[in-house]
Amino acid sequence: MQKMLVAATVTLAAAFSSFATVASAANRDPLDGRTLGIIETRFDKLMDLANKHDINGLHRMFWQSPSALLVAKSAIPSEGSWAGFWGNDAIDQKLHDIAASGPVVLTPDLSKLKVVGLAPDVAESYAPMDITVSYAGQDGTPKPFLMIITWKKVAKDWKVASEIILPVPPAPVARPVQQSGRRS
């Protein structure tokens, strides 16, 4: 009986051990720390080019594909307030229009920049930031945004496959709580 108990314990321990190994492998980032650091450096370069209004440099940062995407403020009412711009020609035109509108300053909170691997050739970055821009009715005061980028490895370089810029809505105004009067 004791031998059966020991055998069952060893079998269960082996089963749980292999389950833990499979679970930890599934949760491991598919990109190593060095690669994630390279993508962080590419993010810094993207911010630098945007702040310099270097449209040609920004063009080279994007994946050259009709599937490349930029989500940004639209100046055309029929597109809605925010719209997706697909393909490099549309992205280049949108970036040109934004840069031509006046000063544009992107100030990311690098302490909150997060880069994760999704696959060996795909990563995603997230960064809250303030953006100062006078494009499409924006008043040129810094406002909070979130920038979410999907990075795609092309040859030996990491390119922006999609860049989604989302405005952070203002916090709701707290309304005073009305207390009902007590009757004695």
Give residue ranges: language-model regions.
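Positively charged n-region of N-terminal signal peptides that target proteins for export
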Residues: 1-4
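Bacterial N-terminal signal peptides
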Residues: 7-18
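Short, low-complexity N-terminal intrinsically disordered segments enriched in polar/charged residues
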Residues: 17-61, 176-183
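A solvent-exposed, acidic/Ser-Thr-rich amphipathic alpha-helical stretch
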Residues: 33, 37, 55-116
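Hydrophobic/aromatic beta-strand elements that line small-molecule binding cavities or substrate pockets
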Residues: 95, 110-115, 129-131, 146-152, ...
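Short, cysteine-centered beta-strand-loop-beta hairpins and adjacent loop/turn segments enriched
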Residues: 101-102, 131-141
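A short, structured loop/turn motif at beta-sheet edges
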Residues: 115-123, 138-139, 151-157
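Short beta-strand edge/turn micro-motifs at domain boundaries
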Residues: 143-175
